[in-house]
């Protein structure tokens, strides 16, 4: 059990990146609140927001954070994974992170575009972010358990 607990501490270094998508997300979701809540989640060591995470500058933020914070997994709260999942996986891989330790929380289509109430949309975005964080933790623990 002690060995498992040591592995858990080593692997749980997650970064959360929340995109404004201009006003597509930020007009309905309180992006700062999502960042604030995500930062409090177990295993999260870095959380930040940016206007366009899919942009070159946004990808550079992800790459730099992976290096500087020694991240083992990332969650990107943004638009549909169909749109930019490959973009974020490539950025993670460029930084030396396993691209399959990237999870997308679709807060544009699932929150911003379908809710008018900011509080409701923000709460749902936080829930989706937490679910994505939990999935990354599970993937990290599973990959480490296989190595034991």
Give residue ranges: language-model regions.
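Residues forming the flavin
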Residues: 1-148
């Amino acid at each position: 059990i002690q060995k498992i607990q040591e592995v858990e501490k080593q692997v749980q270094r997650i970064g959360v990146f929340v995109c404004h998508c201009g006003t597509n997300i930020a007009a309905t979701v309180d992006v700062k609140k999502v960042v604030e809540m995500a930062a409090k989640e177990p295993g999260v060591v870095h959380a930040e927001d940016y206007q366009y995470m899919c942009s070159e500058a946004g990808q550079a933020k992800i790459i730099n954070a992976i290096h500087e914070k020694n991240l083992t997994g990332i969650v990107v709260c943004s638009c549909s994974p169909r749109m930019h999942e490959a973009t974020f996986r490539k950025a993670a891989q460029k930084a030396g992170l396993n691209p399959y330790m990237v999870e997308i929380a679709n807060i544009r289509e699932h929150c911003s575009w379908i809710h008018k109430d900011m509080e409701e949309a923000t709460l749902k975005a936080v829930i989706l972010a937490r679910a994505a964080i939990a999935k990354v933790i599970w993937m990290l623990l599973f990959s480490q358990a296989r190595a034991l």
